Amino acid sequence: MNTTAAEPTAAAAEKPKTHLDLHVNGIGYLNRVREVKVKKGSFWACSIAALHGSIDAPETTYFDVKIEGAEALERVKFLKSAVNANQKVTVAFRLGDIYPESFVYQSGPKQGQTGVSIKGRLLKIASAKIDGMPVDFAEMRFAA
């Protein structure tokens, strides 16, 4: 019988967690890819129309997100031209730290009414399709 104590794993040897993560994984349409310029510099943002519910009649939830992480930013910048050309860009994504933010409609039929936007951080684009054709991120080109 072996009575030696188990070696601590690498994860157990790390510092204790000081932050709790809230992640959302899904599939949706990439829209409004843009660089936002503010006094302290700039950042990249986009919106994602996430699909959920029945495959036959999916519902949509909209997220307005700041793009975090070098790989996610590189992939979104690559997809930007397709979004701007009004092609259908579908992405498998991961969001973090979502929260609601209220706003007032400035124009249109809802002018003056309060709306709610779901904000967050885009952490990852796992895969993408443009007009149904897979994107090869390894080569940063459209797959044939």
Indicate where each model-derived feature is located.
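Single-stranded nucleic acid-binding surfaces, predominantly the OB-fold ssDNA-binding core
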Residues: 2-144
